[in-house]
Amino acid sequence: LKRIKKNNKFIYLISPSKIKSNNFYIELDKVLSSKKVSFFQLRLKKEKKTNKIFIGKKIKKICKKHKVKFIINDDPIITKKLNADGCHLGQKDMNILKARKILKNKIIGITCHNSINLAKKAIKNKADYLAFGAFYSSKTKKIKYRTNLKILNLAKKITNTPIVAIGGIKLSNYKKLLLNKANFLAISGYIW
């Protein structure tokens, strides 16, 4: 889709669950300067909205400097308020059609867990990317849904919509996902 351009920047970086100090912004600037990151997702589940907006404004500047798409997790309202590049929606978050009315032509990505049916629904509703996972064990999040390369390959057969692979991705396993045509690799715990 037009909102996501193909390039060799395959990392979809996700924030730590808490941003405790100003050192984070310095680290983020360094990581984004590697020119391997396409997306940065702000994922602060337990933070107040006002703090998310405050933190989001700082991160947006860093993302813009490095030409990295800035994505907000779960919340189309904050996405719009920050004028972020897009929003990532889980299955229990706002419906994509409702989110699209708020966000217009911004990027909307959808969690599909390990389900081709959820992927088909997201494709029908014109999601900009599909996220599948967890592919591997992760220290960032308790694993509820486990997926595999078979699901990834099935998804690639039914759509050209970009696919983000999630869950426990690190140096020892990332190549297998890229070789099986995942477009982006979501990384959090391995970096932070």
Describe each model-derived feature in a short phrase:
Residues 13, 89-99, 131-143, 168-192:
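Glycine-rich phosphate-binding active-site loops on the catalytic face of alpha/beta enzymes
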Residues 53-72, 98-115, 144-170:
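Alpha-helix-loop-beta-strand connector modules within alpha/beta enzyme cores
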